[in-house]
Amino acid sequence: MAQLSGQPVVILPEGTQRYVGRDAQRLNILAARIIAETVRTTLGPKGMDKMLVDSLGDIVVTNDGATILDKIDLQHPAAKMMVEVAKTQDKEAGDGTTTAVVIAGELLRKAEELLDQNIHPSIIIKGYALAAEKAQEILDEIAIRVDPDDEETLLKIAATSITGKNAESHKELLAKLAVEAVKQVAEKKDGKYVVDLDNIKFEKKAGEGVEESELVRGVVIDKEVVHPRMPKRVENAKIALINEALEVKKTETDAKINITSPDQLMSFLEQEEKMLKDMVDHIAQTGANVVFVQKGIDDLAQHYLAKYGIMAVRRVKKSDMEKLAKATGAKIVTNVKDLTPEDLGYAEVVEERKLAGENMIFVEGCKNPKAVTILIRGGTEHVIDEVERALEDAVKVVKDVMEDGAVLPAGGAPEIELAIRLDEYAKQVGGKEALAIENFADALKIIPKTLAENAGLDTVEMLVKVISEHKNRGLGIGIDVFEGKPADMLEKGIIEPLRVKKQAIKSASEAAIMILRIDDVIAAKATKPEGGQGGGMPGGMGGMDMGM
């Protein structure tokens, strides 16, 4: 409500909540920090897990930051911004989601200290932007260049990513699967590797143990052969991929045929049968002995395919058809009549196998397949879900290193190096912006501090020790949470991709700056649900629900 010549002027609807200036900033910072604190205890190899129970009673137990934030139902807009940080980090780098969110939360905490000293948000924003830009330069400078073909380095990267997750006890196997899968689908363009992770399929099947998980150099499809008389195993398979139903096509118009005699009916049925037989005859003439169809297969067509000894699978997902094409070299045809021998793909074996009581189709032994499947096994659904999350992170970080050829020591070492160098940079910049740069540098120490805290170590003592040793022994010194002391992360093979760290700092600083720019929050009154009681805005932000 505003006033003009002593008369009140109503601008916003009744019930609207408005927070201006410091109130808006405090509430947004508080919401963002709550999100950061929620995931902070999951950071690092000694991080704890979260149990998430949805409205249907489904349970997820994980310490994966992206999964946790994706499953939590949030209402507060600033909290949702923090979730976007995690999503961006996951999309761009594949790992480091918790790191990005924790740094963003700490940057906002340190910004609040400056706001309390009456430093204007614009000055803090400028200082943070300068610090973030300088941090990117420093990371590029301290990064260690590696050979993308060096399997040992790739295995270390994958193992570091899996460490601390529930699947850690099988990290050697899972790291090996991740590296082999990425190397198989990687393609060189202009002398650099390009990896499309869409070409790696994760197929989960509860049963057996995690150690039974395997890499299939081809495609595994959760389908079965359509006809009992068809072969269940075909060697030297010539594979046809058809994006058309093997059925009699229905007319687009509502045409009607008047049949007045049994002969006409017989003739009509014979014509339908001939059309289906011609389709199958054409497939057989190309030399195909395995057919994958994206749509349906008529019962009669199934019968003729079985007579020819052709294995057929129907209603295959489009994504699986594309992977089959990349694995076998087959071309997807949209019209059976257009199918030629040149369109067929090859696999040494196509076989229907029973796993955990269900039939699955294995397409294996492809010549240099550019699509592969990681078959995940485990005792329960919870186990295989966690293994899948671990493998997803692992293949992403291996992709990062193969594409960029650069790594950093882990264990908080890069953050310590950045904190030291940004402190020096702040002295060069001078002015009030220097205070923001110093606070940015100090905020980065939250990563080594949290690693120590989650490992049950004395955080103050450990931070002093690790910074001192880092200055004396070099940038590889971080916190070894297993031995509870500073150690050279490079010597121990505890490394992470440069891309992960750069993106984490970029995402965190951008989110913090975006939240600091907000000085006015206008929250509309919640509408009443149909047939239920209203009640305005629930509590949490004085009218804005924290959603937790």
Curated annotation (Swiss-Prot):
CDD domains: cpn60. Residues 527-548 are annotated as: Disordered. Forms a Heterooligomeric complex of two stacked eight-membered rings. Keywords: ATP-binding, Chaperone, Nucleotide-binding. PROSITE patterns: TCP1_1, TCP1_2, TCP1_3. The lineage of its organism: Archaea, Methanobacteriati, Methanobacteriota, Thermococci, Thermococcales. It comes from the Archaea. InterPro entries: Chaperone_TCP-1, Chaperonin_TCP-1_CS, Cpn60/GroEL/TCP-1, GroEL-like_apical_dom_sf, GROEL-like_equatorial_sf, TCP-1-like_intermed_sf, TCP-1_chaperonin, thermosome_alpha. Molecular chaperone; binds unfolded polypeptides in vitro, and has a weak ATPase activity. Belongs to the TCP-1 chaperonin family. Signal peptide: none annotated. GO terms for biological process: protein folding. Residues 531-548 have a biased composition (Gly residues). GO terms for molecular function: ATP binding; ATP hydrolysis activity; ATP-dependent protein folding chaperone; unfolded protein binding. This is Thermosome subunit alpha. Pfam families: Cpn60_TCP1. Gene3D superfamilies: GroEL, GroEL-like equatorial domain, TCP-1-like chaperonin intermediate domain. SUPFAM superfamilies: GroEL apical domain-like, GroEL equatorial domain-like, GroEL-intermediate domain like. PANTHER family: CHAPERONIN.
